Amino acid sequence: GTKKLWIESANRDADLALKVTKKIDEAQAELTPDTDLVIEDRKEPSSAIEVLEELMADPAWSSCVTVLPSAIKGAEESVFANLKQLKTYLLRLASFAAARRTRRGTTNEAIAEENGLGGVYRRAVSFTAETKYAEDYIARWNGAARIFGEHLTVGFSVNNARCFSAHFLFDQHSGKIVIGRMGKHGCCTRSNS
């Protein structure tokens, strides 16, 4: 009965995690290419929105991550330059979501660290950001305006070409990460974005 369904669900999540991990390994290989390997006729994304669109078209990634229109708009406006790094972290975000489905009782920070997000993951925005600059972190999900406090920040600069943020929540019902805001770093106590 219930135990069998749980085991089947865990097996599906494990298979999905393996697929996502393979994609992460492929992206990591792009970050540190083997000098003997030559890849021809492969169009690299030229913008953050192209990276996002490529991932959203991937069934394994999109089974772990939902991207809201507000985040797509932010990616369209983004001038972030390190697109290979962005792709790697967004792939890891899918792996993070798959792990959170089955790792109840483990802190999100520990799961993030295990999935290669330790240096860029934060579980919440600051109190000042959430209160004074809330509009930079709000998106609508399931009919309600919500603060998307969990986030990844790639790079640490007020220069939008060198810093990229993705703000999200974990939807318990679907077991997916929902990205509500993406692109430039929102205002907080340490930025003037």
Language-model regions, residue ranges each:
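Basic, Lys/Arg-enriched alpha-helical interface segments
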Residues: 1-164, 171-193
